[in-house]
Swiss-Prot record:
Lineage of the organism: Eukaryota, Fungi, Dikarya, Ascomycota, Saccharomycotina
Known role: Involved in mRNA export coupled transcription activation by association with both the TREX-2 and the SAGA complexes. At the promoters, SAGA is required for recruitment of the basal transcription machinery. It influences RNA polymerase II transcriptional activity through different activities such as TBP interaction and promoter selectivity, interaction with transcription activators, and chromatin modification through histone acetylation and deubiquitination.
PANTHER family: ENHANCER OF YELLOW 2 TRANSCRIPTION FACTOR
Subcellular location(s) per record: Nucleus, Nucleoplasm; Cytoplasm, P-body
Subunit relationships: Component of the nuclear pore complex (NPC)-associated TREX-2 complex (transcription and export complex 2), composed of at least SUS1, SAC3, THP1, SEM1, and CDC31. TREX-2 contains 2 SUS1 chains. The TREX-2 complex interacts with the nucleoporin NUP1. Component of the 1.8 MDa SAGA transcription coactivator-HAT complex. SAGA is built of 5 distinct domains with specialized functions. Within the SAGA complex, SUS1, SGF11, SGF73 and UBP8 form an additional subcomplex of SAGA called the DUB module (deubiquitination module). Interacts directly with THP1, SAC3, SGF11, and with the RNA polymerase II.
Molecular-function annotations in GO: transcription coactivator activity
Protein name: Transcription and mRNA export factor SUS1
GO biological process terms held by the UniProt record: chromatin organization; mRNA export from nucleus; protein transport; transcription elongation by RNA polymerase II
Pfam assignment, any one: EnY2
Keywords of the record: Activator, Chromatin regulator, Cytoplasm, mRNA transport, Nucleus, Protein transport, Transcription, Transcription regulation, Translocation, Transport
Organism name: Lodderomyces elongisporus (strain ATCC 11503 / CBS 2605 / JCM 1781 / NBRC 1676 / NRRL YB-4239)
Gene3D superfamilies noted in UniProt: 1.10.246.140
């Protein structure tokens, strides 16, 4: 099978798993658990601080009308800067818990 064929088949499998996750209610349960663990670990606060620091540091100069000019001009710009930092801040324990939960779900699905 070609590389594109492998990717297509893999995408179909991923899509079916995601559909089953959603329809079974497991997606919502896993999502809620992830959110709770991120809140408890202080991850949201850290990411919010990174975003605020980026916005504060990106103001480059005063404008003629008394405002500030920002090098981060859009939400997309901010997302591009913050996303990799936020991903790196996810505690290993949270990652491991989520991977175990997904692995258990997949094991049950296959059996």
């Amino acid at each position: 099978m070609t590389r594109d064929g492998d990717n297509s088949e893999l995408n179909q499998i991923k899509s079916k798993i995601q559909e089953h996750l959603v329809s079974s209610g497991n997606y919502e349960l896993i999502s809620k658990q992830l959110k709770l663990q991120l809140i408890e670990s202080g991850w949201y606060d850290k990411v919010a601080q990174i975003a605020m620091d980026e916005l504060n540091n990106s103001s480059s100069k005063d404008t003629k009308d008394g405002g500030r000019a920002y090098t981060t001009k859009s939400l997309s710009d901010l997302y591009t800067v913050v996303k990799p930092k936020a991903e790196g801040l996810v505690p290993n324990e949270v990652r491991e818990n989520m991977l175990k939960r997904i692995e258990l779900y997949l094991d049950d699905l296959i059996e």
